Amino acid sequence: MSKVKKNEDTLSEVLVDVNRVTKVVKGGRRFAFSAYVVVGDKAGRVGAGHGKAKEVNEARGKAKQAAKKRMMKVPLYQNRTIHHDVVGKSGAAKVILRRAKAGTGVIAGGSMRAIFDSLGVHDIVAKSIGSTNVYAMISATFDALNKLASPKSIAMRRDKKVNEISIKSSDIQVNE
């Protein structure tokens, strides 16, 4: 099996957070910078990474490399939204992701918006509950994205055909 070389030119990069951190040593304080970056190809692949260095640009570069290593493929519905609603948690942060109709747009706050823009999602509604810490929210969002499954993958897991597991609202009969 040959590895497919990733085209790094098409990756979009969003700097989500930069902090100045301090290490106290015997001779005083040593300052450094920590950066958190989200990268994606706007076609269903996204990753996030953290980097720390003496300079902001070095920290950003390390974070970008870490994000590229942690990239994941997310199944998208019609290349614009997610297949189903999902909840993700990380510590005290909880994130609810809901699929949306075409034309809705990205309704999400803060760091979640950066993930969806890098992922290539055009229609989604996201709500964060609990902690609004950037790291916790991104972790919770990735937890939710990991739980997503396409109808094709669900059908394969259940040894069924896709049309056997998909339920259309017109197929539901109501007894009156």
Swiss-Prot record:
<keyword id="KW-0689">Ribosomal protein</keyword>
<feature type="domain" description="S5 DRBM">
    <location>
        <begin position="11"/>
        <end position="74"/>
    </location>
</feature>
<dbReference type="GO" id="GO:0015935">
    <property type="term" value="C:small ribosomal subunit"/>
</dbReference>
<keyword id="KW-0699">rRNA-binding</keyword>
<dbReference type="InterPro" id="IPR020568">
    <property type="entry name" value="Ribosomal_Su5_D2-typ_SF"/>
</dbReference>
<dbReference type="InterPro" id="IPR014721">
    <property type="entry name" value="Ribsml_uS5_D2-typ_fold_subgr"/>
</dbReference>
<comment type="similarity">
    <text>Belongs to the universal ribosomal protein uS5 family.</text>
</comment>
<dbReference type="InterPro" id="IPR018192">
    <property type="entry name" value="Ribosomal_uS5_N_CS"/>
</dbReference>
<comment type="subunit">
    <text>Part of the 30S ribosomal subunit. Contacts proteins S4 and S8.</text>
</comment>
<comment type="function">
    <text>Located at the back of the 30S subunit body where it stabilizes the conformation of the head with respect to the body.</text>
</comment>
<dbReference type="Pfam" id="PF00333">
    <property type="entry name" value="Ribosomal_S5"/>
</dbReference>
<dbReference type="InterPro" id="IPR013810">
    <property type="entry name" value="Ribosomal_uS5_N"/>
</dbReference>
<dbReference type="GO" id="GO:0019843">
    <property type="term" value="F:rRNA binding"/>
</dbReference>
<dbReference type="InterPro" id="IPR000851">
    <property type="entry name" value="Ribosomal_uS5"/>
</dbReference>
<keyword id="KW-0694">RNA-binding</keyword>
<dbReference type="Pfam" id="PF03719">
    <property type="entry name" value="Ribosomal_S5_C"/>
</dbReference>
<dbReference type="InterPro" id="IPR005324">
    <property type="entry name" value="Ribosomal_uS5_C"/>
</dbReference>
<dbReference type="GO" id="GO:0003735">
    <property type="term" value="F:structural constituent of ribosome"/>
</dbReference>
<comment type="function">
    <text>With S4 and S12 plays an important role in translational accuracy.</text>
</comment>
<dbReference type="GO" id="GO:0006412">
    <property type="term" value="P:translation"/>
</dbReference>
<keyword id="KW-0687">Ribonucleoprotein</keyword>
<dbReference type="InterPro" id="IPR005712">
    <property type="entry name" value="Ribosomal_uS5_bac-type"/>
</dbReference>
<protein>
    <recommendedName>
        <fullName>Small ribosomal subunit protein uS5</fullName>
    </recommendedName>
</protein>
